[in-house]
Amino acid sequence: MEDRSEEGGDHSEMPSAPSTPPSKRKSKFAGFGKFFKPWKWRKRKSSDSFRETSEVLERKISTRKPREELIKRGLLVEVPEEDGSIPSESPPLRNGHMSVEPANPPEDSGGLKRKTRPDSTGPRPKSGETTVQPCATAEVAPLEPHATAEVSPVQPQASAEVTPVQPLPVSEVAPMQPLPVNEVAPMQPLPVNEVAPKQPHHVSEVASVVSRPTSEVAPVQKVSRDFSKQPLLPPKRPLSISTSVTQESAVAGQKSDSSNRLQSSAPVPTPRTIHPPASSKQPPVPPPKPQNRNSNPLMAELSLALAGSPLSPAGSRPSPPLPPKRAMPPSTDAVTNKENALGPASLPPTPANEIITPSPPSPPASSHIPVSNPPVPPLTLAPPYTEVEKEQSASPIPLHIRIQQALNSPQPLPLLDSSQRAQSLLFMQNDMGPSEEGTRVRSLPVTIELLKVPDDEDDESLEDESLSPESSESHTSKVYIGDVPSVTVIPSYLPTCVQEEEEGGVSDTDSEGPVLYRDDEEEEEEEETSALANKVKRKDTLAMKLSGRMASEDSNSEFPQRSREEWNQIRQDIGTQLNRRLSQRPTAEELEQRNILQKNEADRLAEKKEIKRRLTRKLSQRPTVAELVERKILRFNEYVEATDAHDYDRRADKPWTRLTPADKAAIRKELNEFKSTEMAVHAESKHFTRFHRP
């Protein structure tokens, strides 16, 4: 019994443990304790566990997360004995190139074994591959500085471990004292933000020391293959074209320029650049469009190459042999500027070898300008008279006479046949001046049609071109033919496709030179703008508007003076038309009757007062019942009797207002009988007189 009582006591105590003691249940706020106490207990417990787990997680993150992430990415290989991490495989570089292949793997792996711990069990395949990588980079460095400058920013986290593995080659390339392994990587592993800042030091020193001699260029096929593998990220210009590389390449380009210009049959020298030539597998890359065509320093090379191959516009006819061209000698400043433009490090990234891919050898007549030119007589505006006289003798009518006739006659002359066409030469002026050998100069043949009488619009465009001194000096050559004082302005052929945009007559596909790639959208925009400019030049829209305005003002001022009677007639017609329309309108009374026109408020009040006054007057004059009986107006006074009736609710259910069906039948019968007796009808139609259904 005691055991049961003890067990019962235990059972009674167990459920009462979580609840409050019975003394507290008597208080007012016992219910609040039930609600809030478990909530407080849970919050306190959860905060303790959260703090413990957060500490554990922070400890794990600070120690292991960087290494795990790097191992997952493939940047590190886990070494259990040593704290330093070794890169596992060579990832693609940031600028889109692959790293260089190892030169001799057996020596590198052996050298790595000597540097690392002696108790490590054999080289792993991955670690062998990755540790060979820095050795190969350091050994190939004097031969391929391009690859060295790109390999140096590869491993942002593993740069601290790469340095002690190969102290000798890196110290040869960059004067930098390597640290031992225990100083670089202590036993406590460092997070990412502490290891990473060491990396730009290597890149800057390696990139600043490394220079690229032009005679020791690495094989370009490997780099071009890496280009085709990863074309997503373009190479960064400060890495691929460093200042030292461009300086040495510019010096070599100047030397080859000066040597090739003296030789007439040599091809056009192109400055040496990092970009690989297009291989047989890859299609030729279209060059980007230059920013400013006139001021580009590489346009000189293009213009010289274009001068070599004779370009003829579309539809040009064959011309007689070319006379020697007299041109201004190129100033020494222009020559020095041209050579200096190829040299400095701010070279635009569109070299001439991309713009001129074929680069045909120029004939002896179009050889390059020697650096020291003998002085040439100044430019004369008229061609030799011998050629002009030959052409005039070929046609029956002399050319200057036809020009005088064309200028004097107001109508254009009819076109003659091909035998009477005057063919002349257009002498080309390049920005760099003519290329001479002896006294003969090769220029572009252009046929000139017969001169017509220019319209006013053409005169304006010619005056604009002749008045501007810069355009007349640089782009035009004035030709005086015979004794005529009139000036024919002929625009010269500009280098590249600038004139094609302005004229719109010569297309890129018709020219024999290299195809100059242009974006279609930009070409359309240029055509639109040039067309708009030509339209504005041709048509003076302001004068047309002003003339039209003056004509309209004159017509307005002359009209009333000229036709007063007609104006009066028009006014009368309008008046009669308005009167007819007004007569067809409904009147105000009709609109009021149709409730369309609302009456005025004052009129409505006055009308109500009038109605009230009339009614009161009639009621006041109304005779009484006695007067009507006396005047014998009321003759049925014997059965008319007036009784005072009490007001009652007829809607109420009263017994005297309730009719039974028998009462209703009796009423109907009485009415039918009354009607049949009151009306004298035929016997056959008597049933029509029934008032109610019986």
Curated annotation (Swiss-Prot):
Residues 318-327, 372-381 have a biased composition (Pro residues). Gene3D superfamilies: 6.10.140.1750, 6.10.140.2130. Its main location: cytoplasm. RPEL repeats lie at residues 55-80, 576-601, 613-638. InterPro entries: RPEL_repeat. It comes from the Eukaryota. Signal peptide: none annotated. This is Phosphatase and actin regulator 4-A. Residues 240-267 have a biased composition (Polar residues). Pfam families: RPEL (PF02755). Keywords: Actin-binding, Cell projection, Cytoplasm, Developmental protein, Neurogenesis, Repeat. GO terms for biological process: actin cytoskeleton organization; closure of optic fissure; enteric nervous system development; negative regulation of integrin-mediated signaling pathway; neural crest cell migration; neural tube closure; positive regulation of catalytic activity; regulation of cell cycle. It is found in: Cytoplasm; Cell projection, Lamellipodium.
